[in-house]
């Protein structure tokens, strides 16, 4: 038998799962967490559809890539940071931001027309008052 024979039982090694090491930045909040937390609110205030879709995609990405240790910490009410929100809340906020941006399709708002008669009357009155004062000073 050759040494490279795969069928030999002494060459078989069972698989042992090894957890990857924690990264340098895993314990500290990153800039993506700040952006992920503030984008849904920016979409709500600005009613910008691009920002709303961006926040939804980013929240789904954060939700799918959240570490299991962080989820367990949230369930035990031991969040890594007091300002950090659970991934489900971030996803819910981005969905609300998207709904607010498209709310005009369900509840359209009428644009107020400027009244043309009110502004002309005020302008004419001001001109007449000015000419009356000028004529009175010219007579004296």
From Swiss-Prot:
This is Uncharacterized protein YPR063C. Residues 131-140 have a biased composition (Acidic residues). It is found in: Endoplasmic reticulum membrane. Keywords: Endoplasmic reticulum, Glycoprotein, Membrane, Transmembrane, Transmembrane helix. It is a single-pass membrane protein. Glycans are attached at residue 36. Residues 113-122 have a biased composition (Polar residues). The chain crosses the membrane at residues 91-107. One of its GO terms (cellular component) is endoplasmic reticulum. Residues 113-140 are annotated as: Disordered. Present with 2140 molecules/cell in log phase SD medium.
């Amino acid at each position: 038998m050759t040494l490279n024979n795969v069928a030999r039982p002494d060459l078989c090694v069972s698989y042992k799962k090894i957890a990857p090491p924690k990264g340098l930045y895993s314990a500290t909040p990153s800039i993506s967490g700040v952006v992920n937390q503030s984008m849904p609110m920016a979409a709500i205030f600005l009613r910008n559809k691009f920002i709303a879709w961006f926040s939804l995609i980013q929240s789904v990405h954060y939700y799918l890539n959240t570490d299991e240790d962080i989820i367990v910490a949230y369930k035990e009410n031991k969040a890594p940071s007091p300002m950090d929100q659970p991934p489900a809340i971030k996803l819910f906020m981005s969905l609300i931001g998207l709904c607010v941006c498209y709310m005009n399709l369900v509840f359209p708002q009428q644009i107020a027309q400027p009244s043309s008669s009110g502004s002309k009357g005020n302008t004419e009155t001001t001109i007449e008052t000015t000419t009356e004062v000028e004529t009175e000073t010219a007579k004296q």
